[in-house]
Amino acid sequence: QQAIDDLVDQFEPESVKTVFSTTSQSHAASEYFESSGDKIRFFFEEAVFDECGDLTTPKAEALNKIGHALHDLHPVFESFSYHPRLARLAEQLDLEDPRLIQSMVIFKQPKIGGEVIWHQDSTFLYTEPMSATGFWFALEDANLQNGCLWVLPGEHHNGLRQRFCRVDGQLKNLDFPDALPFDVARAVPLEVSRGTLVMLNGLLPHYSKANVSDQSRCAYTLHTVSGKALYPADNWLQRGPDMPLRSLSTGATE
């Protein structure tokens, strides 16, 4: 938590005002967002700026998330993300050559923490074959009031519905033919205590409601993909050649 607080303290909000929203997807047109795969960048909640573009709330209470390469660029997050216990867990789950590709601090701020619509992580971290896996760490208690995760048990067996990728220089959602809508009537909430790790198959649909409570619901997330799978060049999340993906098991790039 101290590392998160330090990052926020050092962040100068005057330098960027990119909003992250899964409902409006306004961030998709932002170069700041598009090029964040190998950087540490800050994204705001909606409705935290006035008509002049000034923050209406303290920056620590206005951020939606920090991403997407904390695990490789910040020593505290790096030490946690490449911990041998996570490598052993990945081995127990038979993850093939897991490579850390994304990390995020998700704040889910009190009162203004936005809804995250139903989605599958493989939509954004597409590989052939599918290999994305999510590690979701509850940094605070997550409950129905402050926007806990909801999932659709077993739905990961029904394939990928959508892909978020670059088309003619723009980021777009592409629907797969014959994709069926999610049966959200079967949704199950995941209320968990601080310190809980939730593992998410990349094809498992999940969602969280807006946080209308007085309590934040902060989480740290990691995502891996297989180093043996194809990671297409038109995926939205890309890295420069000077920062290849590192093995969760060894921390090495080979």
List each model region and its residues:
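Non-heme Fe(II)-dependent double-stranded beta-helix
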Residues: Q1-E115, N235, M243-L248
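Non-heme Fe(II)/2-oxoglutarate
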Residues: P13-K17, H156-G169, R194-M199, L203-E254
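A generic structural signal for short beta-strands and their flanking turns/coil linkers
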Residues: D38, E45, S131-T133, S216-C218
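Catalytic core of non-heme Fe(II) oxygenases with the double-stranded beta-helix
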Residues: L73, A87-E91, R99, I112-P189, ...
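Exposed beta-sheet edge/beta-hairpin loop segments within beta-rich domains
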Residues: F80, V188-E191
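A structural signal for short, well-ordered beta-strand segments
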Residues: S103-V105, F135-F137, Y220-T224
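Conserved short histidine dyad/triad with adjacent acidic residue
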Residues: F107-D121, G202-Y207
